[in-house]
Regions:
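Beta-propeller domains
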Residues: 13-44, 72-75, 172-297
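Hydrophobic beta-strand positions that form the internal "hydrophobic ladder"
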Residues: 11, 64, 108-112, 166-169, ...
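Predominantly five- to eight-bladed beta-propeller fold
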Residues: 33-35, 69-74, 78-81, 132-160, ...
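Short loop/turn segments that connect beta-strands within beta-propeller blades
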Residues: 30-33, 86-90, 124-127, 216-220, ...
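Blade-loop segments of beta-propeller domains
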Residues: 33-71, 96-101, 278-282, 287
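Short, solvent-exposed loop/turn segments at conserved positions within beta-propeller repeat blades
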Residues: 18-21, 73-80, 113-114, 204-208, ...
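Short glycine-/Asp-/Thr-/Trp-enriched loop segments that recur within the blades
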Residues: 44-52, 139-155, 230-235, 279-288
Length: 297
């Protein structure tokens, strides 16, 4: 996967070097298409003997979050081990084991992630973890990660987002308690299959009850957003605007023919509808990662 650098003149690619049998993250020049640098090579990093599955830059592009030992869950979701790599010093440190969706804060000082259905924050300077939610439980409560329906129908996994000033995290909570269960045999490496049971609402059955929450990093407090005006609804996307105190949230009814775009106040959790879309048939949600906020919001 090609990733454009912020200088706009270069891009990075995860390559496999046949000669050294090594995975490496290479930097290329857009104008010449020639390689100009190699950021990291697995042949020089014993901790990455299992390879590199994916990587993400911090906002200043001085650090990399590198995933390996990935284990799939559903179509898009997976858990993985994660390493923090400092490009200038070439220092590599394993910081997280079998977690989901670790994401740098915009200021590059923290990493939010989900482990066993709860949200945590890793502080890079102090190398400490703090827990945001505590009620996560398999097949009951999910914080910050989508359930099967959202992953399959709305094509996203990470259900949390950092504010632009790195002071808040907005996240969706899924209560799957009343969703019917489905079991299936999984044939893996073992001699006999194992049975996996997960929440799977068929047409007309109960969906997860979703709620929207705002976490303040400094005060370590959480506010629940009042969405009581809606009934049997989805929250198919959340995204902080350019204003660090305004979260946008899309609210879609179950018939998927009525969509509200809300602005949520990051301090009071008050909401207002800034856009409504209706359709006699249904609202096409194939590509709804399409919000662009201007500089003045």
């Amino acid at each position: 996967e090609l990733q454009s650098m912020k200088n706009t003149n270069q891009y990075t690619v995860l390559n496999f070097d046949q000669a050294s049998r090594s995975l490496q993250i290479d930097v290329f020049d857009f104008a010449t298409l020639k390689k100009v640098n190699t950021l990291i090579e697995t042949k020089n990093q014993s901790q990455l003997s299992d390879g590199i599955d994916s990587y993400a830059f911090s906002s200043d592009e001085k650090q990399l979050l590198i995933a390996n030992n990935s284990n799939p869950i559903y179509r898009h979701s997976f858990t993985a081990d994660y390493f923090l790599y400092t490009i200038e010093t070439k220092g590599l440190t394993k910081i997280l084991e079998q977690v989901q969706e670790p994401t740098f804060s915009p200021d590059g000082k923290k990493i939010a992630y989900v482990k066993e259905n709860n949200i945590f924050i890793y502080d890079i300077a102090s190398k400490t973890n703090s827990q945001i939610t505590t009620d996560g439980k398999k097949n009951e409560i999910i914080n910050g990660i989508t359930d099967w329906v959202y992953e399959e129908e709305f094509a996203f996994v990470r259900a949390f987002d950092w504010s632009k000033d790195s002071k808040k995290i907005g996240y969706i909570r899924f209560d799957e308690t009343q969703v019917p269960e489905f079991s299936m045999s999984v044939f893996a490496k073992e001699l006999y299959p194992k049975v996996e049971t997960f929440k799977y609402p068929k047409a007309g059955e109960k969906n997860s009850l979703v709620s929207l929450h705002l976490y303040n990093v400094d005060s370590k407090s959480t506010k629940k957003v009042d969405l009581s005006q809606y009934n049997d609804f989805y929250i198919p996307r959340i995204e902080w605007t350019n204003d660090g105190n305004i979260l946008s949230a899309k609210i879609l009814n179950r018939h998927q023919d009525n969509l509200d775009l809300l602005f949520v106040d990051g301090t009071t959790a008050a909401t207002k509808v800034v856009l409504n879309e209706k359709n006699k048939s249904y609202i096409d949600f194939v590509d709804k990662d399409n919000l662009t906020f201007l500089a003045d919001n």
